[in-house]
Curated annotation (Swiss-Prot):
It is found in: Cytoplasm. Required for resistance to DNA-damaging agents. GO terms for cellular component: cytoplasm. The keyword Cytoplasm applies. Transmembrane segments: none annotated. This is Universal stress protein C. Disulfide bonds: none annotated. GO terms for biological process: response to stress.
Length: 142
C-alpha cells in the first residue's frame, strides 16, 4: 500500500529524528507528503511565575518548538509539507489534522518517557478512533 500524506507526532527530543527517519523511509519511494505535529509545552506545568511572565515564557517556548521543528525538517533531507503545534489533547488534534489535511498514515513513538508516554496514550486514542493507519515505532533511549 502506498501512502500519500504521513503525519508524524514528534517531541522536542532527539528520539524525534528516529520517527521522522521512519516516515521519510516510507514517504520517499512514493513521494508522499510528510507533516509534523507536536504538543506545545505549557510553562504552567513547570513554573509558578506571575501571569505577565507566563505569556513571555509561552512565547519563548513556542518559538523554541518552532525552531526545533524547522531544524528537524532540515535534517530530514525530505520536504516537510506542514507543521502543527497543538495544545491540549494531542489525539484530538491528530484526528482533526488527519481529516482536514487528508492524512492516511500517522506515525507515533512508543516510549516510556514524559512526552512519549503521553503520546503513547494519545496513540491508543488515535488507534481506537482513527479512520487511517497508525504506526507505533519503538524508540531507543531508555
Amino acid at each position: 500500500m502506498s501512502y500519500t500524506h504521513i503525519l508524524v507526532a514528534v517531541a522536542v527530543t532527539p528520539e524525534s529524528h528516529q520517527l521522522l527517519a521512519k516516515a521519510v523511509s516510507i514517504a520517499r519511494p512514493v513521494q508522499a507528503k510528510v507533516s509534523l505535529i507536536t504538543l506545545a509545552s505549557d510553562p504552567e506545568l513547570y513554573n509558578q511565575f506571575a501571569a505577565p511572565m507566563m505569556e513571555d515564557l509561552r512565547a519563548v517556548m513556542h518559538e523554541e518548538t518552532e525552531n526545533f521543528l524547522k531544524m528537524l525538517g532540515e535534517k530530514a533531507d525530505y520536504p516537510i509539507e506542514q507543521t502543527f503545534i497543538a495544545s491540549g489533547e494531542l489525539s484530538q488534534h491528530i484526528l482533526a489534522v488527519c481529516r482536514k489535511h487528508h492524512v492516511d498514515l500517522v506515525i507515533c513513538g512508543n516510549h516510556n518517557h514524559s512526552f512519549f508516554s503521553r503520546a503513547s496514550c494519545s496513540a491508543k486514542s488515535v488507534v481506537s478512533a482513527s479512520q487511517v493507519d497508525v504506526l507505533l515505532v519503538p524508540l531507543a533511549g531508555d
